[in-house]
Structure formats: structure tokens, C-alpha cells
């Protein structure tokens, strides 16, 4: 079977539309809900309520763990209620303690691009130690840096990332 592990219900994609598309294409969907501070699901009660509405649907259910505090925001029992859990390193505290969402340009404050890249790689390697099954959006760069991808993702940095990933035993999207 073919499976897309990272599908979100948004932009007009409802569970009904997703089910129909899945049947038509033969691709099974892992539906993910964003869970964390400032996201769709922010506590165990909301998480269980969401799961109650989805258990009868023809999908594998995933938790996309957001922010680095998700491990303490949600109980282990609640997290384990999903079929699998994945995360990325796109929400974190930067080197000055500012909450950063890498896709929100105004939150990405870069003084020194190479130092910022090193900080992002540190965050990625730390995230790989979190209790998840899969790491996603693996090498995302903010808009201010994305046009020079090869300059920032050097062989040395790639090696560090790949070694940390291998050590973690996690799947990579």
C-alpha cells in the first residue's frame, strides 16, 4: 500500500474530501493535527475530543507535535493515543530566548546567518532526541536564507544532521 504520512485538513481539504481522494487514488492518508501552544490542540482534553471525532474515519491518525514544550504540554498517555507522532524543528526558542516559527518572517531575527544556521542545526539535533516516530520538514530554511540552501547546508552540517538522525533511529519524511 501507498501511504502519505503527513496530510493536514486545511485549505478546503475536509475529512470527507480526503477520504474520497484516498479511495480514488489508492493512497492511504495519515491525517495529522497540530498539537502545541498556539496550535489547534493545546491540551489533553482537546486532544481526546479530537480523537473521539476521528476514530470512525478511514485514516491513520498522527500528532504533529509543535514547539519544544509539547512533551510536557501533553501526557504520555495522550500522545500514545495516536497511531504515530511526528515533529519538526520549525518552532523553537532562538539564541536570545525568542519564540520563533521559521515560516513567520517577522519572527526570524538573524544577526549572523552562519551563526543562525548553526543554532538551527543545534535545535534540529535536539529535536531528534524527542519521543517521536518521525522527523519532518527536515532541512527547512527561513525565507531570508532559502535562496542559498547549498551555502548553508554544507557537507559538515549535513553529516552532523544525518549522524544525529541515524543515532535517533527515527524515520525521516
Region spans (language model):
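Short, acidic/polar
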Residues: 12-19, 69-77, 118-126
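Hydrophobic residues within beta-strands of alpha/beta enzymes
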Residues: 29-30, 85, 135
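An N-terminally biased module of ancient metal coordination in phosphate/nucleic-acid-related enzymes
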Residues: 1-69, 142-146, 150-156, 160-161
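Domain-core and long-helix interface of multi-subunit machines
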Residues: 81, 89-92, 101-173
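Active-site flanking residues adjacent to catalytic metal/cofactor-binding acidic residues
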Residues: 5, 63, 87, 136-137
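Structural alpha-beta junctions
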Residues: 27, 55-56, 83-84, 165-169
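Conserved, mostly hydrophobic/aromatic
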Residues: 6, 85, 172
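Active-site gating/metal-coordination segments in enzymes
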Residues: 49-115
